[in-house]
């Protein structure tokens, strides 16, 4: 039996940038829409058959461009299909008692330099998502006090996607520390209102669920179930197999989760093989860094796509 491993580096949740916070806060407060910066149409990527592969990147320490360096030896397709910027935060303004979207200086740098840090991946055919994470301040996806408050935060998210030309948003309900700063505990309506509003704002973008925290277990309220508003959901425990508890088809689920460089290659391969054997359509990886991870990536590409991976330095 695999031992659950949860080693996400928390510096993305802890490193604060007042300037970035003020910029986002003032935009939200004024109600001004961000100027759209649409992603360019990707160049036709070599066709590959098999599950969608996902790479989370800790941008406090690593470059998003590493995701595009790995391709398949057979056919030249991308080893990774989705790259996730880890991570923006949901913060709490104690003065206005409202949640707001916050970017630390490293996330802000990636977004500000989208032309060089994001567009090359998109032009290669890789989707780029923004992960949003709690920040120990009591604000989270599961404790908005009203539909209006949830919708206001959804607008901040969709404005950021439009402004920076992203392909979608990933929800990760960790480190919120509900109750801090006098905030409320999770309620049943909050996440439903948030996801409903976000999907209405960006009907053609990706919304994914890191299947953890109070939000992940509160997907229905008042006769509304938001499960089908997600494009993907994945297991959050690296080195394990756990089917996300959400009503999505197998093609949109990743029961497998691995941490590159920490999960053994044999386990990486076993989980990839099981993904194919049991008909699941997504394979999640975390913490791709700037080292040569060809052997680690090949451990799953052999099973998912029948090919070794190659790395372009």
UniProtKB/Swiss-Prot annotation:
Residues 1-42 form the signal peptide. Changing residue 172 to N: 0.1% activity. Residues 51-307 form the GH18 domain. It catalyses: an N(4)-(oligosaccharide-(1->3)-[oligosaccharide-(1->6)]-beta-D-Man-(1->4)-beta-D-GlcNAc-(1->4)-alpha-D-GlcNAc)-L-asparaginyl-[protein] + H2O = an oligosaccharide-(1->3)-[oligosaccharide-(1->6)]-beta-D-Man-(1->4)-D-GlcNAc + N(4)-(N-acetyl-beta-D-glucosaminyl)-L-asparaginyl-[protein]. One of its GO terms (biological process) is carbohydrate metabolic process. Its EC number is 3.2.1.96. The active site is at 174 (proton donor). GO terms for molecular function: mannosyl-glycoprotein endo-beta-N-acetylglucosaminidase activity. Keywords: Glycosidase, Hydrolase, Signal. Transmembrane segments: none annotated. It is an enzyme of class 3 (hydrolase). It comes from the Bacteria. Pfam families: Glyco_hydro_18. InterPro entries: Endo-Fsp (IPR016289), Endoglyc_H (IPR054861), Glyco_hydro18_cat (IPR001223), Glyco_hydro_18_chit_AS (IPR001579), Glycoside_hydrolase_SF (IPR017853). GO terms for cellular component: extracellular region. Cleaves asparagine-linked oligomannose and hybrid, but not complex, oligosaccharides from glycoproteins. NCBIfam families: Endoglyc_H (NF045482). Belongs to the glycosyl hydrolase 18 family. This is Endo-beta-N-acetylglucosaminidase H. It comes from Streptomyces plicatus.
């Amino acid at each position: 039996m695999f031992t659950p491993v949860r080693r996400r580096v928390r510096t993305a949740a802890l490193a604060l940038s007042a300037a970035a916070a003020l910029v986002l806060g003032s935009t939200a407060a004024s109600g001004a829409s961000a100027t759209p910066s649409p992603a360019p149409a990707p160049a036709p990527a070599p066709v590959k058959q098999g599950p969608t592969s996902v790479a989370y990147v800790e941008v406090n320490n690593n470059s998003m461009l590493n995701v595009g360096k790995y391709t398949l030896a057979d056919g030249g397709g991308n080893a990774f299909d989705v790259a996730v910027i880890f991570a923006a935060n949901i913060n709490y303004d104690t003065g206005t008692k409202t949640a707001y979207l916050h970017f630390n200086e490293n996330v802000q740098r990636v977004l500000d330099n989208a032309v060089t840090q994001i567009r090359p991946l998109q032009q290669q055919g890789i989707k780029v998502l923004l992960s949003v994470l709690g920040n120990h301040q009591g604000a989270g996806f599961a404790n908005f006090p009203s539909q209006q408050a949830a919708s206001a935060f959804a607008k901040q998210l969709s404005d950021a996607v439009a402004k920076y030309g992203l392909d979608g948003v990933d929800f990760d309900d960790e480190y919120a520390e509900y109750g801090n700063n006098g905030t409320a505990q999770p309620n049943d309506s909050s996440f439903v209102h948030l996801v409903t509003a976000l999907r209405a704002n960006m009907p053609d973008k990706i919304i994914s669920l890191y299947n953890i925290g109070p939000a992940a277990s509160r997907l229905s309220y008042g006769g509304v179930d938001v499960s089908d508003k997600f494009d993907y959901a994945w297991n959050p425990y690296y080195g394990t197999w756990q089917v996300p508890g959400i009503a999505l088809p197998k093609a949109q689920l990743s029961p497998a989760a691995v941490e590159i460089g920490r999960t053994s290659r044999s386990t990486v391969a076993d989980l990839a093989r099981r993904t194919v054997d049991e008909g699941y359509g997504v394979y999640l990886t975390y913490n791709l860094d700037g080292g040569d991870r060809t052997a680690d990536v090949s451990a799953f590409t052999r099973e998912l796509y029948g090919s070794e991976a190659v790395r372009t330095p």
